[in-house]
Amino acid sequence: MESIQDFTYPYVIKSCCGHGGSQVFLVHNEDEKKQALSKIKDEYVIQKLCSNIGKDVRVYVIGNKIVKAVLRTSKESFKSNYSLGGSAREYNLDNYEIAMVKQILNKFQIDYGGIDFTFHNGKAVFNEIEDAVGARMLYSVCDIDICREDKNVRWIHGNFDFKCNEFCYYKI
């Protein structure tokens, strides 16, 4: 395992518990490192900076199956989060990317989440697994309603002890 001293600038420091890019920092020097670490109150991850900054792919997963992928880009920031003003569009995974997702899904059971990839020299690089990702970005780029998709609702019903009640708007 590398230590923080083993990384050369620039690199990314991010909280293990952050969401929406709020605790993700691009660090160019010792002062920026200290400032970033002072804002992170829990465990953190350090990542080498990929060559294609401001661009990543989120793969939406339900029941350990790929639902859809979305390409996120930003012209103003190294963070491409939709919630921070990044743009989004549907994305078709290539065979290499599908194979990477399947390897991850073989090791982890993802009931509902996202698998994120950044790009280095034009090639997808695994970034992180997000639990309980928001679906607003997905709704903005395609017709899938991830909460009402028949197969998704059926998967939830088949894998949890609770059933729909008066608060459920889906009819099976």
Go through the PLM ranges and name each one:
Residues 1-54, 95-98:
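Active-site nucleotide/adenylate-binding loops and adjacent lid/helix of ATP-dependent enzymes
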Residues 11, 45, 65-68, 113, ...:
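Protein kinase-like catalytic core scaffold
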Residues 16, 49-50, 60, 116-118, ...:
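Anionic group-transfer/hydrolysis microenvironments
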Residues 23-26, 36, 57-58, 70-71, ...:
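A short secondary-structure junction signal
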Residues 25-28, 61-62, 127:
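Short beta-strand-to-turn element immediately C-terminal to the catalytic PLP-Schiff-base lysine
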Residues 40-42, 51, 62-76, 81:
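Catalytic core of tubulin tyrosine ligase-like
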Residues 78-126, 159-169:
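A long amphipathic alpha-helix within ATP-dependent nucleotide-binding catalytic cores
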Residues 120-172:
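C-terminal active-site "lid" helix and adjoining low-complexity regulatory extension at the edge
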